[in-house]
Design a protein with these regions (language model features):
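Short acidic-capped amphipathic helix/loop micro-motif used as an active-site/signal-coupling element
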Residues: 178-181
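Active-site and donor-binding regions of nucleotide-sugar-utilizing enzymes
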Residues: 1-151, 165-172, 176
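Charged active-site motifs of nucleotide-sugar-dependent glycosyltransferases
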Residues: 156-163
């Protein structure tokens, strides 16, 4: 049972809410959808309490999930595991106190986060590998000609190659890409 996306649907279980109905980027979209955000938060909390799982695994999305973790710690005895740790090393580092208080186990896909959480904040974290890196490594092993061919075909042998990463969500790309390509 989960609030999630297409990949979670593919492996089974019951989807309560698709993440596309939960994620809003930017000040104005969040403001315009505040009622929906709070309704989704309430529904999630009620669903967890009604279902009483043995553990809740939160995945990424700290704006929503840290609130769920806080609720679970205050109102239930359900253990909270957090996969893809909040990027507090990039911003909102103060959230470490909430993580320490509300999260039982933290799992990271970035190896440097182990040192950040354990050495700097004395909070244990499990590095579990990075599925994106694994996929890229596998793809490149199966298709070694792809990148080399691209470089050769576009005469980029001696030129720097720049990755333009506008975001992972449609709204981020829509908002960021026009500014990035100027």
């Amino acid at each position: 049972r989960f609030f999630g996306g297409d990949l979670m649907v593919a492996v089974g279980g019951t989807m309560v809410k698709h993440y596309k109905e939960l994620a809003y980027m930017g000040f104005i979209p969040v403001l315009l959808h505040l009622r929906t955000i709070f309704a989704n938060m309430k529904r999630c909390k009620e669903d967890i309490v009604a279902w009483q799982p043995d553990v809740v695994i939160l995945v990424d999305y700290p704006g929503f999930n840290l609130s769920i973790a806080k609720f679970l710690r205050a109102k239930t005895h359900i253990p909270v595991y957090y996969y893809i740790s909040p990027k507090i090393w990039a911003w909102k580092e103060y959230r470490i106190k909430n993580i320490k208080r509300d999260v039982d186990e933290l799992f990271s896909i970035l190896p440097f986060e182990v040192e950040f959480f354990e050495d700097k904040h004395h909070y244990p974290i499990h590095y579990v590998g990075n599925p994106t890196v694994d996929e890229v490594t596998l793809f490149r092993a199966e298709h070694p000609e792809t990148f080399d061919g691209f470089v050769r075909e576009n005469n980029l042998d001696s030129k720097p190659i720049i990755a333009l990463l506008a975001g992972s969500r449609k709204q981020e790309i829509k908002d960021n890409l026009p500014h990035m390509i100027r």
